[in-house]
Amino acid sequence: LLCKEFRTERNHPIVLAFDSGYLMREPVDGVAKLDHAINAGLLLAFMSVKAGDQVGLFGFDSRVRLYLPPLGGNAGFSRVQRRSADLDYSHEETNFTLALTDLTGRLNRRGLIVLMTDFVDTIAAELMLENVTRLAQKHLVIFVTLQDPHLQKTAAQRPERLLDVTQAVVAENFLRERAVVFEKLKRLGVHCLDVPPE
């Protein structure tokens, strides 16, 4: 009699990559996008460590601000939790080329990269797309952005004044451009999450 027991693979490197550029300073529901991202990242780190994986941390804006190589166990989570407090908002524009090239060079084995960032439009996102695509050739990448409930509400509400029409058109165009970027990333093998802040 033969019996197979299946176990979930363990000991995978997971890197939480936080963009701390000026777009992540913007508040959503009264809290900065970076703070929402850090809270979600810490929850993911806790669950990953409990599942037996290693967790690392990477913070960047115009340059790399923080790197912790992936480490497992409670010590790994404690270290990520402690050092995530060092992530701070920046007034500088994010340099995806420098940051993601640096991250790729630091990681020796294939892993999961959870990239928490934001972008404004397709033009600004072109350079980001190129670098995320290069990262996705070596690693599994999850691209995470936060939805802006006010923007979605503005695009969906029925306009009553001329100003409302203008705001709705701008909001709808912005949402459409975001959808175009997400679609490009998905075609390139990147998993995308555009999630509400809660």
Feature names for model-found ranges:
Residues 50, 54, 90-93, 109-113, ...:
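Intrinsically disordered or highly flexible coil/loop and linker segments, enriched in small
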Residues 1-75, 110-117, 123, 130-134, ...:
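An amphipathic, basic-hydrophobic helix/alpha-beta surface used to engage anionic
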Residues 109, 123, 127-198:
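Von Willebrand factor type A / integrin I
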Residues 34, 70, 89-93, 118-121, ...:
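Hydrophobic alpha-helical scaffolding
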Residues 75-112:
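Von Willebrand factor
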